[in-house]
Amino acid sequence: MALLSGIFSSDMAIDLGTANTLVYVKGRGIIMNEPSVVAYHVKDGKKQVLAVGEDAKLMLGRTPGSIEAIRPMREGVIADFDTAEEMIKHFIRKVHKRTTFTKPKIIVCVPHGATPVEKRAIRQSVLSAGARRAGLIAEPIAAAIGAGMPITDPTGSMVVDIGGGTTEVAVLSLGDIVYARSIRVGGDRMDDAIVNYLRRQQNILIGDSTAERVKTSIGSARMPDDGRGASMLIRGRDLINGVPKETEVNQAQVAEALAEPVQAICEAVMTALETTPPDLAADIVDRGVMLTGGGALLGDLDLALREQTGLSISVADESLNCVALGTGKALEYERQLRHAIDYES
């Protein structure tokens, strides 16, 4: 029966991220990557789903009073249960074709630091959205698998997964987590830091989407060698007279804005090294540290970490997709990786 269920359903793995949700279908790979956003039309106190994913993200910060755009995930876990369920249900229906006969089995990655209540909320959302069975896998393990790290070897490996809401620092050996710490610093905190910096330094208020564009275009974890670096024009609202304003921001300013979240990530890595058993720490010195997640793409972050730790730092080839790929591999090779998947209710 289990074999027939696998044949006639689209079993899937989901990276339920704060910023984006990625869906991996067994035997097909990653087939969907959309923003974790739901837009509602609100009338007489009743909500009706208007858009989910990319279309809903376009509405963030631009909605009239009757439309509400919500990000149901915050810092890697569900902040709005009902909205998360609507979003997951939409993505499952989009991927799970009506030609299949049974509900899909779904594995979802969760932050290592998620509480039992938060894990239960994710599992219940997935089951309510139409899964026949819901498994959970720790995000650091999924990230390491997706990055191709030899986590089942009897040696230490360190992975630093920088997502939208959290950064997970973990030391792995023999297929399990030896040490892990989750800090509430990620891409969203970096965007907030840019918004706050420009508000203080240039009296301009920009939206989250503009801050994200600045981060991805000229964001840097280190001061540029020439003291200025690349620059770009941005538009926002002048906080002095309230009118629209265009101004230039350069790489040095962005590096200054990001100094605090970057330092928090560096300190989390240093704490992990100090806490790791000596033999495993020696392995990490030999093999270096792997960066995954969208935050790993921040300019010169690997160099900043190398300067602070003295270790070799590598960025995974598909850092944005590592967690989804790793969760997908856990689905594909479930028998070999069953120790990493939690199906407990």
Give the predicted meaning of each segment:
Residues M1-I162, A170-M290, A296-S345:
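Nucleotide/phosphate-binding catalytic cleft detector across ATP-hydrolyzing
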